[in-house]
């Protein structure tokens, strides 16, 4: 007969068995949690930035598009990266294309100050965490 105690026991036993069979299981779970927390933090910080931008518009704002060279390869990884960028206020994933033989994600930003810094922020923030979550902590 199903009960809450049986469910919790089965859940815990499942975690133990998985951790014994796959050594990287907990590291992968930690990488996924790291990505989710980073995404939530980015949404929060960017929301405040957009609120400030709307209430106190800066002079000489430069909206722009940056081309982010992709290390993510699978459709799932690319979709996750594009979705994370679009979920973050002030940025929007536009298109996936190629430039000089390299697959690129084109991203529109609300306030583009330094294109290189924006690309590094996306690659070091979102892309690196996605690769760790999908390919394992040793992927990068």
Task: Give the role of each language-model region.
Residues 64-140:
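Terminal membrane-proximal soluble interaction domains of membrane-associated proteins
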Residues 37-74:
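Flexible, solvent-exposed loop/hinge segments and secondary-structure transition points
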Residues 1-50:
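Membrane-targeting alpha-helical segments
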Residues 22, 26-27, 57-58, 136:
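Transmembrane helix-loop junctions in multipass membrane proteins, especially transporters and channels
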